[in-house]
């Protein structure tokens, strides 16, 4: 009896201590970093020159880390390519790389910097985390030697990886992730042989990490949420904005809502390549975001998040739409191009009404009312159901309400940043063949609309109030991962299309 009581006491004590040491909320920070680039050269520089460039960027990151820590942040995310920039060859990136060990080695570089060779960048990041008692997420390059015993070993005898690292508040390396889905011009890096699903636990939730282009694919992004059940995604990125559907703050906030997870996105700040857009996103609404194409300055964002976001019911994305009768009100369909994909459109000719447009298996239904019907602005409802083959190969189903660039219907789908028409209400749904649908609402001047819309359990994206600003787009962006072509295999249409239409911007650049 005494032993049983003692065990019960110990169990209760352990539960109380564990609850006391865990946090219901935490303060997240992301830093949009105005990266300092090395001199443009394809010739490898000396290790000393490479370290000098990296230290200049680390000086700026140090200021952001220190400021975030003083404001109570528990974790800070910094961007992809934030320490050395971009536009490298396989040879010219090499002086910037370090050997990054498996975190299972239990290593604090600040205390033991030479344990794995010359690792000055890891040492500095570790000391920054330790000195400021904060988790730091950074993106650097990893190098791993190989030989002929490995049939996949590159000719130069090494693997080079685009790598995210995480140091905890004591400076310990707790996570290392090698980017799986490399973008077209990331020839300086290798993809890992298998997707890495990287997680770590803290007193303020379970975290997963992936990088930039990974967000468009199932592995490891969806796996982290669906199978590993992380609370928060860490997302270093070097994202080039492409409207109307792939601006950074628009798509990243939509992914957080669609996957029902916290999402910390840190982008490079480099307006010359349309790189801007960072945010702290909760499943229900953005907590903080930044988009700035006008200045050349970085930006630190902080916001409070729930450590364990409240679970929400799974959305049946086709439930409502499958029971709606088509409403075309006599309008004629026309086609338009969005990022090389041919959409089927209907012009919204009235101040309000109900419209339906279909393509293949996808029918999109819209109910709406504008605040006024302007003669100088045209809006359209569009549908796309097909395989996207430019700068990656991935299957999409998209329903979108968008503003056309001009009153010429041929401009529907072109990039637009400003509008004048507000909407009193909207409700958008579609007969999606996937559970992976990401809801986007983007307002004039590239602004989000936190708290102004919601997704119902039956798959409707609808407004809660009149929009606070003019509307650029209201979109349901669906991904059918099972219909993707083979990984890392791009259609010949990619090169052909880029040659035929060189004015079209890539959505992500290295």
UniProtKB/Swiss-Prot annotation:
One GO CC term on file: plasma membrane
Signal peptide location: 1-22
Membrane topology: Lipid-anchor; GPI-anchor
Carbohydrate attachment residues: 39, 87, 147, 201, 316, 354, 504
Domain CN hydrolase: 31-307
Catalysis: reaction(s): (R)-pantetheine + H2O = cysteamine + (R)-pantothenate
Top-level taxon of origin: Eukaryota
Main location: membrane
Pfam family, one: Vanin_C
Covalent lipid sites (GPI-anchor amidated aspartate): 492
Record key words, sorted: Cell membrane, Glycoprotein, GPI-anchor, Hydrolase, Lipoprotein, Membrane, Signal
PROSITE patterns linked to this entry: CN_HYDROLASE
Active-site residue list: 80, 179, 212
EC numbers: 3.5.1.92
BP GO annotations: pantothenate metabolic process
Cellular localisation: Cell membrane
Residue stretch(es) of the prosequence: 493-510
EC class (word): hydrolase
UniProt subunit comment: Monomer.
Family in the record: Belongs to the carbon-nitrogen hydrolase superfamily. BTD/VNN family.
Functional description taken from the UniProt entry: Amidohydrolase that hydrolyzes specifically one of the carboamide linkages in D-pantetheine thus recycling pantothenic acid (vitamin B5) and releasing cysteamine.
Protein name from the UniProt record: Pantetheinase
């Amino acid at each position: 009896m005494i032993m049983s009581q003692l065990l019960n006491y110990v169990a209760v004590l352990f539960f109380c201590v564990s609850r006391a040491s865990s946090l219901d909320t935490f303060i997240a920070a992301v830093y949009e970093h105005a990266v300092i680039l090395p001199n443009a050269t394809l010739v490898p520089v000396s290790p000393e020159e490479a370290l000098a460039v990296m230290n200049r960027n680390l000086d700026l990151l140090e200021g952001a880390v220190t400021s975030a820590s003083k404001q109570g942040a528990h974790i800070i995310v910094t961007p992809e390519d934030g320490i050395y920039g971009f536009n490298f060859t396989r040879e010219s990136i090499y002086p910037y790389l370090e050997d990054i060990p498996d975190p299972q080695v239990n290593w604090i570089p600040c205390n033991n910097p030479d344990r794995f060779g010359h690792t000055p960048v890891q040492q500095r990041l570790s000391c920054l985390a330790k000195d400021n008692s904060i988790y730091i997420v950074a993106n650097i390059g990893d190098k791993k030697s190989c030989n002929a015993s490995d049939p996949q070993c590159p000719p130069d005898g090494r693997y080079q990886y685009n790598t995210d690292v995480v140091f905890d508040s004591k400076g310990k390396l707790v996570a290392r992730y090698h980017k799986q889905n490399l973008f077209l011009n990331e020839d300086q890096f290798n993809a890992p042989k298998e997707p890495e699903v990287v997680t770590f636990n803290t007193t303020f939730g379970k975290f997963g990490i992936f990088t930039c282009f990974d967000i468009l694919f199932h592995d490891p992004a969806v796996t982290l949420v669906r199978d590993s059940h992380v609370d928060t995604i860490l997302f270093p990125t070097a994202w080039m904005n492409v409207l109307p559907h792939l601006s950074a703050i628009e798509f990243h906030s939509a992914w957080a809502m669609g996957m029902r997870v916290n999402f910390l996105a840190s982008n490079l700040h480099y307006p010359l390549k349309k790189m801007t857009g960072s945010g702290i996103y909760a499943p229900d609404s953005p907590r903080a975001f930044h988009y700035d194409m006008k200045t050349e300055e970085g930006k630190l964002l902080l916001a409070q998040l729930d450590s364990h976001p409240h679970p929400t019911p799974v959305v049946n994305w086709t439930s409502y739409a499958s029971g709606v009768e088509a409403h075309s009100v006599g309008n004629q369909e026309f086609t338009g191009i969005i990022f090389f994909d041919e959409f089927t459109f209907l012009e919204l000719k009235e101040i309000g009404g109900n419209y339906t447009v279909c393509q293949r298996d996808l029918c999109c239904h819209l109910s709406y009312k504008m605040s006024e019907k302007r003669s100088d602005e045209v809006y359209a409802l569009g549908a796309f159901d097909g395989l996207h083959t430019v700068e990656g190969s991935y299957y999409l189903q998209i329903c979108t309400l968008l503003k056309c660039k001009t009153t010429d219907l041929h401009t529907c789908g072109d990039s637009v940043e400003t509008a004048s028409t507000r909407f009193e209400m909207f409700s958008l749904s579609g007969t999606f063949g996937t559970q992976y649908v990401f809801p986007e609402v983007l307002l004039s001047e590239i602004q989000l609309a936190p708290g102004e819309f919601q997704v119902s359990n039956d798959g409707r994206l609808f407004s809660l109030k009149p929009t606070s600003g003019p509307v650029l787009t209201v979109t349901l962006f669906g991904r059918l991962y099972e219909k993707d072509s083979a990984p890392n295999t791009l259609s010949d249409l990619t090169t052909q299309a880029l040659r035929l239409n060189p004015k079209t911007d890539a959505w992500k650049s290295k």
